[in-house]
């Protein structure tokens, strides 16, 4: 490719609203162009990178037995009604009407669509298992699109779905796809982790995330320093903590505690640890057609994990869509006093009460007395009936691993893939069944598997690039080599550059010849910005010495290559990381 023919509209400065370096570099280097909030055009350089990512994905998925299809981006809303997700998914689901007043959605995921296909065409266990996948555009109407391709509204996704006759077959495919994803991300040259995760709006019994470690990541993962335990903070677990020695033993009594509304201030008032203070967190629960209140109790030195809390509510049948923090008006209407909320008589004020599992059968607790400026001491939870316990706390750094007691640490990460065991939920709601070996009708066991293809552009750059511009990995750079002519007006330099260009092309090197009538410094700046893997300099010294200066983009390391060894050395450098 000649640079003079390449459509790569680089900018002098990155967009003012760009925060992440990946967003800055992709926009400034002419990879992407924003046309609306969270909506981007992919220009030739970005398309080359996308094609490479997609080719790797196709190769690995098909090696693992998956078949490529292409489903409609527009789906009947009635399918989403049948699955129950039309209301559950929320405002991120874009719903519209056609001219005949039919309701449709722009797909953020395609569980309903693929399940309908299976229901219509898979009739017997003899056709199972089957794994179908696609790479296609998706749309999620994010409330705050940001960070360029990291949280866009329109994005490119690889999503796959598998159908099975039993849970054992699903388990095998879950691990098979996990292996495929590991190979894909390894081929892309990424440092990643596999972590246990929440299934979210997609649902299912088990899910794992594939996350790229980067300080700009939106997610926090909890990693054991001693074993391979890793989980998204939303579902991370810990070992039971040892009880502090300073136990506030007391007879059950009510004490005046003026102006002590925090767990820390209550602990200081009674000269004990926040561990023994029962902290109440009230949340407004949003249902499909109503709002209620829930109170969650954790120890005073713990924090509530909102995702765990929402899941705990739904396990007991709340059918909650989301949680919001209850404000002072909400508390006043319920007859509650912030800072003094406790379990005594609480059922008449809120619809749901859940205690963290770490509190089970705890005694010597200090709790709010549901009376302004009063707390109760010497409280024993064994004296209460029918309490609901669940894991609802957010794991802290220095907590201990649930598997080996090792120390837990936080890491920032960016999710790039997710695999789920969906079970029979979608099959039952959409009446997708087959006949088993005994001729009996059974519902499909389903798996769901996704990779954010367009997000991977940002993930690679967040992990690999520097302040100068894009640094791509071995298998993702838009070009292997850019040949930079020091002085294009020197016919000898120009002639040699074109000869070298042809020599490299014949060896299968994806080369870019910078034949633009521009300053040498500007050309090198574009090399740093765009991120070809190597820059080969053709200058006056090259003509005299028959040696080329070659620069690696990853570390800007310079190397001298003799003309006679040019192709061999370039291929060696490209073969290495």
Curated annotation (Swiss-Prot):
It comes from the Bacteria. It is found in: Cytoplasm. GO terms for molecular function: aminoacyl-tRNA deacylase activity; ATP binding; proline-tRNA ligase activity. Its EC number is 6.1.1.15. InterPro entries: aa-tRNA-synt_IIb, aa-tRNA-synth_II, aa-tRNA-synth_II/BPL/LPL, Anticodon-bd, Anticodon-bd_dom_sf, Pro-tRNA-ligase_IIa, Pro-tRNA-synth_IIa_bac-type, Pro-tRNA-Synthase_IIa_type1. CDD domains: ProRS-INS, ProRS_anticodon_short, ProRS_core_prok. SUPFAM superfamilies: Class II aaRS ABD-related (SSF52954), Class II aaRS and biotin synthetases (SSF55681), YbaK/ProRS associated domain (SSF55826). Keywords: Aminoacyl-tRNA synthetase, ATP-binding, Cytoplasm, Ligase, Nucleotide-binding, Protein biosynthesis. The keyword Electron transport does not apply. GO terms for cellular component: cytosol. It catalyses: tRNA(Pro) + L-proline + ATP = L-prolyl-tRNA(Pro) + AMP + diphosphate. Transmembrane segments: none annotated. Its main location: cytoplasm. One of its GO terms (biological process) is prolyl-tRNA aminoacylation. It is an enzyme of class 6 (ligase). Belongs to the class-II aminoacyl-tRNA synthetase family. ProS type 1 subfamily. Consists of three domains: the N-terminal catalytic domain, the editing domain and the C-terminal anticodon-binding domain. Catalyzes the attachment of proline to tRNA(Pro) in a two-step reaction: proline is first activated by ATP to form Pro-AMP and then transferred to the acceptor end of tRNA(Pro). As ProRS can inadvertently accommodate and process non-cognate amino acids such as alanine and cysteine, to avoid such errors it has two additional distinct editing activities against alanine. One activity is designated as 'pretransfer' editing and involves the tRNA(Pro)-independent hydrolysis of activated Ala-AMP. Homodimer. This is Proline--tRNA ligase.
